[in-house]
Amino acid sequence: INEEEISLKDGILHHQENVDLLPANIELSALEVTMGNVMSREMIMKEYIDAIRSRYDYILIDCMPSLGMMTINALVSSDSVLIPVQAAYLPVKGLQQLIKTILTVKKRLNRKLAIEGILLTMVDFRTNYARDIASRVHTTYGSQIEVFENVIPMSVKAAETSAEGKSIYMHCPKGKVAEAYKNLTQEVLKNEK
């Protein structure tokens, strides 16, 4: 942003499960304001991602639930987007605006951007509410955008992983969330072919 050269290794953490992470920190929250006057501000992340792309099979960018400049940067940097949405009223309500933003980025900034699909998360199918939300997502978006068959269930074990600094596969490898992520990965890879 300030034209300083950034080392391609700066901030990357190597995890024992053969995954590299570039975690966000508190300074990232001020970045949105700083980016306001930067030329080609939508392309900042793309420059970095393009520089490291050849080192990885896949690069996943996990964005905050916001349509700010960091999310726009992530969309410009990406080949495709998987839209996670909690099985609750307010997140589903914001889905239309997110899809509109994705399509605008595709039209103006990243023509190759594709929507992989919508992933329902924090789903508790024991409740009528979650079943209703899932049904509403399928009805509203299913004809235009794939809604993944696999969903990520509500689970305390999933919430515990952040505090422990472990993946769900190390924390609770035989649990329903680990199984759901494994199945989702297979579904996404199958769709890629």
Write out the residue ranges for each language-model feature:
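P-loop NTP-binding core
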Residues: I1-K193
